[in-house]
Amino acid sequence: DDIKLSQQYDVLDLFKYMHQ
């Protein structure tokens, strides 16, 4: 499940990057 959390964070980072 830890990987799932990491993946979610990765998506969030990607979203932030796209929004930048």
Swiss-Prot record:
Parts forming coiled coils: none
Signal peptide limits: none
Molecular function via GO: G protein-coupled receptor activity
Keyword Cell membrane: yes
Subcellular location, principal: membrane
Keywords recorded for this protein, A-Z: Cell membrane, G-protein coupled receptor, Membrane, Receptor, Transducer
Superkingdom: Eukaryota
Gene Ontology CC terms, in alphabetical order: plasma membrane
Membrane disposition: Multi-pass membrane protein
Location of this chain's protein in the cell: Cell membrane
Record family assignment: Belongs to the G-protein coupled receptor 1 family.
Protein purpose: Putative receptor for octopamine. Octopamine (OA) is a neurotransmitter, neurohormone, and neuromodulator in invertebrates. The activity of this receptor is mediated by G proteins which activate adenylyl cyclase.
Protein name: Octopamine receptor
Biological source species: Photinus pyralis
Higher taxonomy: Eukaryota, Metazoa, Ecdysozoa, Arthropoda, Hexapoda
